[in-house]
Every structure is written in C-alpha cells, then in structure tokens.
Swiss-Prot record:
It is a multi-pass membrane protein. Disulfide bonds: none annotated. InterPro entries: MATE_fam, MdtK-like, Membrane_Transporter-Flippase. It holds the Pfam family MatE. NCBIfam families: matE. CDD domains: MATE_MJ0709_like. It comes from the Archaea. It is found in: Cell membrane. Its main location: membrane. One of its GO terms (cellular component) is plasma membrane. It comes from Methanocaldococcus jannaschii (strain ATCC 43067 / DSM 2661 / JAL-1 / JCM 10045 / NBRC 100440) (Methanococcus jannaschii). This is Uncharacterized transporter MJ0709. Belongs to the multi antimicrobial extrusion (MATE) (TC 2.A.66.1) family.
Amino acid sequence: MKNVEILLDDPKKAVIEVSKPIIVATFIESIYSLVDSIWVSGLGADALAAVGASFPILISIYAVSWGLSIGISSGIARRVGAKNKEEADKVANHAIILALIAGILYIIAVYPNLDTLFSLMGTYGDCKSLAIKYSSILVLGTVIFTICDALYGIFRGEGNTKIVMIASVIGTLTNIILDPIFIYMLNLGISGASYATLIAIIISLLILAYELFIKKSCYVTVKLSKFKPDLKIIADLIRVGIPSALIEITVAVSFFIMTSIIMMVGDSRGLAVYTGALRITEFGFIPMLGLASGATSVIGATYGARSFEKLKTAYFYTIKIGVLMEIIIVALIMLLSPILAYLFTYTKTSMGIHEELVKALRIVPLYLLFTPFILTTSAMFQGIGKGEKSLIISIFRSLICHISYAYLFAVILGLGMFGIYSGLVVGEFTAGIFAFLFGVLAIKALIKSK
C-alpha cells in the first residue's frame, strides 16, 4: 500500500507526509480546546478555573488511551518495517481488546474517587463542584476514548494518517458546533461541554471503525473472532504503552502539584489566568505533538528495517522543522497577546483577569522553543520500542524541572505567578538539553551496534 511505501522511503519525505495530516488534525483539535475554554469562560472565572483544575483528570484519561495508542503505533510500524504483516495483524487485534480492558479499569479506579482527588488539589467551593460535574461525565466515557485512540494507533502505525485526520477533524468540528448548543441553548452549563466532547469522540470512532471493519482500507486485518492472547505481543505493547501512559500521568501529576503551588501564591483567579495561558499556548504545543507522532511511525519503520542512518535523519529533521515552527508560533502569540487575552475575558465575570493574562502570554509561550527537542527524542524512543527511556525524560521534565523551578521562583524567591511562568520556561530549557543529549547518544549507540 502507498502509505507503507512512504514509511520506508526517504525519511525526510516520510516525516512530512505522515505528519501533515496529524498536524492538521491536532491544529483543529487545538482550536476546539481553545473554543471549548472560551465558551466555558462565559460561565465565569470559576468555570474556567474548574476546567483547569480538571486538567490532571483529563490528562490521566488521555494517558491511558494515548499511551496505549503509542504502543500500538510503534508495534505496528516496527512490524511494517520488518515486512511482517501477520504479526502486524496480531498487534491490531490485541490493541482493541486491551483498549476495552484499560478503559473499564480506569472508570472503576477513578470515578468513585473524584471528590477526594479534587480536594487533594486544593480546589474548593464552586470551583470544586463545577470541576466534578465537568470531569465525571468524561471519566464515565473513558472506554470510548481508549477504543478510539486504539484505532488511531492502528492507522498511524502503518502511516495511514489521512484517515486519522478525517476522523479527528470531523469529530472536532462536531464538538465546536455542539458546545454552545449544549452549554447555553440547552442550558446544561459546564456539563454541556463534556457531553459535546463524548458525542464528538463517538463520531470519530464510528468513522475509524467503518474504515477498518467495513471498507477495509487498512493494511492490517482485524478479526476479533480469531483473537488469541499472545504474551509476547502484550509485553511489547505494554513496554511502550505503559511508559507512554505514565508520561502523560507525570504531566497530570505535575499540573496537580503546580495547581497546589498556584493556590499557595494566588487563588482561583491565578489558576484561571494560568489555564487561559496554557490553552492559548496549546496552539504551539499540539502541532509539535502531531509532528512527533508522525516521527514515531517513521522512526519505528526505519528501526524495524534496521536502517539506522535513516532513523538519524528522521530524528534531526523532525527537530529542525519543529524548532522553526515554534519560533513562528511563539512570535505570533506574544505579538497578539492583548487580542488573544480577550478570548477568555469577553464577559463581565471574566474581564478582570485580562491584564494578568496578557502578562502571562508574554512569558509562558517561550517554553515552546525547547519542546521539539523533548518531544522528538521521546518519539524516537517510543518508535524503537524503548518507552521506558521516554518516561525518564518525562519525569525529569515534568516532575523535577517544572516543579522545582516553579517552587523556587514562585515560593522561595517570592515571585508569585511570575515565578510560575518563569519556572515553566527555565524547566523546559533544562529538560530540552537533557533530552537532546540523551537522544544523540542513543542514536550513536544504534549505529555503532549495526
């Protein structure tokens, strides 16, 4: 198939061709994330803060589904590179079953404990009740997220990212349309945003399922009726999937701790500003995430084919494109910060944070300049099936660098919210240097071992 040929061709061309649809999809998703927050912010600062407080919960859902999805992409890509279709088919079958089990286990573990989790984060009053209302609906729909991302992983693994883009964009546009209808017209408030998200994910899932099971446009063949557990495949998916999931969980834990630090030096107002700044900054982060996602498939295929020089080319080219992209995005966000801030301060209940949000948008986006080194290196390790090394990078980045610098600047040095923003940037810079050196040494070792 053409998408498989692209994966095994020129690595620079492959990175661009595989990543383009994912970048488009993730860019549209970032627009949704922003629009979602804009509609919610119309309910007041407490509602926007509630979405921010829910971030660790949402990230943990994302961790389970996306972590498994990365494991699936890597597993299939490596087998495509090795030209072993039978094993790729087995990975796809295991993917769907494991996604179902993971989703059910998550619901059982998290849903009964939401109240306790938000209390531990230091949220209280209206902010806490709104956060529970917003996140509980999404938690109950976790199985939908996990199965949908498993199918995304199957298509990405074979380089068929056009289908990924179509399903994602249609789902996202549906979400954007449904948000104001559910939140305001149906008077569901913050719960309406959650219902809109679930319906959108279901639509994306149906599109992917149609392509895989009915149209059969996929390179791999999925026949669940012939599923037989294979411990070797399960172990392979777990080796990449669990560290990938833990990477997202470290981000959630980091935000959990960061929320506590923010509440120490500020209040729900400070959290609302931080949340707004992050949502706008996602415009820069999420396209890079799409580029790294494409790189995972390309690097996985080159690794499976044992073409380590191509792997090296794909790695450095992805970083180069990522840095150039981030420079442009950061410049635009900082230049347009007074205008962008109005996206979250357009009502009487939220206009009081406009000036603070503008200040945040002139500092926070700077961390994006160092993100390509981190995400590309993490994608490289995931692609070659060494997810535990990606986890090491994430722990160093989120739990050591971000938290340590934020606490140092905000609390110990008494810089308040400015310290939070500065800590994020300095932490990303430090983690970027570490990740890049780690990646370069790993590639040298691969080339030497051949």
